[in-house]
């Protein structure tokens, strides 16, 4: 998916009155009207994204932008972290009934619960993105455990927005159950403008996508069982229960009568049957170093 911010109308009339030497992260003063896209440019990007099979998601910053997006058939909206506690704006977005992704930088669980209630009351589908609103976000501030806790608290999908070039945040988020990942990408981190230095270049992004998908595969089902891939090693190293001494037919088998040997011989009783064997009755005469078979005891 591709996400584009749409900040029209969110600043005062003096929004660009920044001295040239005042810099935010990156290389330009931020915010900057030069970075904005017109409605026509957004529609052009939207159309292009659809032709290459991408969902196009925009972060509106005021009501008119919400109306523009809904009018043009937006399938999903994105609420920026700075507006997550702007409850009147949350209500407006939720009233449109368009599924919404809500970023949660700079918020706490109580504030998130208010937003959750707003969307639930409006019967508008939504999910949260866990994130840290710092560019780049330090590893120690990523606080990925929130993902698991938020899943438990709200019972909805939780994603992760990683504002850095590291891989650990994204891969850790996937391992903790994040369903959506947001990353900034750029043609080059040497380009002028905010956010470029905290973004991945496309080759790096492709590598991260591969690793994230591999992580999903590696997570598996959570069911623990004997796997087909383990059969080879099991066949080479598995142990069988072996008699340490002769045992007469009708005698009770004790733990002192038993040991285990590594053997690739077919049949035999595996060590996991130990508690079943101890106390059982020998059904025939058994000899020292004999591999115990299931028919030998009862």
What are these regions (language model features)?
Residues 1-298:
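Catalytic cores and adjacent flexible loops of soluble metabolic enzymes
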């Amino acid at each position: 998916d591709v996400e584009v911010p749409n900040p029209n109308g969110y600043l005062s009339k003096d929004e660009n009155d920044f001295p040239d030497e005042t810099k935010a992260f990156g290389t330009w003063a931020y915010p900057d009207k030069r970075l904005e896209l017109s409605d026509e440019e957004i529609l052009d990007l939207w159309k292009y994204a659809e032709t290459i099979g991408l969902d196009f998601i925009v972060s509106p910053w005021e009501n008119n932008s919400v109306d523009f997006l809904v009018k043009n058939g937006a399938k999903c909206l994105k609420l920026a972290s700075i507006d997550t506690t702007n409850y009147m704006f949350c209500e407006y977005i939720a009233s449109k009934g368009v599924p919404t992704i809500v970023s949660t930088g700079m918020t706490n669980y109580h504030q998130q619960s208010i937003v959750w209630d707003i969307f639930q009351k409006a019967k508008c589908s939504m999910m949260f993105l866990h994130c840290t609103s710092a560019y780049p976000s330090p590893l120690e501030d990523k606080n990925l455990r929130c993902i698991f806790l938020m899943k438990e608290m709200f019972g909805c999908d939780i994603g992760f927005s990683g504002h850095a070039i590291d891989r650990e945040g994204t891969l850790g988020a996937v391992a903790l159950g994040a369903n959506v990942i947001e990353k900034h990408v750029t043609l080059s981190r040497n380009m002028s403008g905010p956010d470029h230095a905290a973004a991945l270049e496309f080759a790096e992004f492709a590598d991260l996508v591969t690793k994230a998908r591999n992580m999903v595969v590696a997570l598996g089902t959570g069911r623990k069982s004997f796997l087909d891939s383990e059969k080879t090693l099991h066949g080479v190293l598995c142990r069988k229960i072996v008699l340490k001494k002769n045992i007469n037919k009708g005698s009770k088998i004790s733990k002192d009568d038993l040991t285990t040997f590594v053997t690739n011989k077919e049949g035999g009783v595996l060590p996991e049957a130990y508690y079943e064997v101890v106390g059982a009755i020998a059904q025939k005469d058994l000899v020292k170093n004999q591999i115990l078979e299931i028919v030998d005891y009862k």
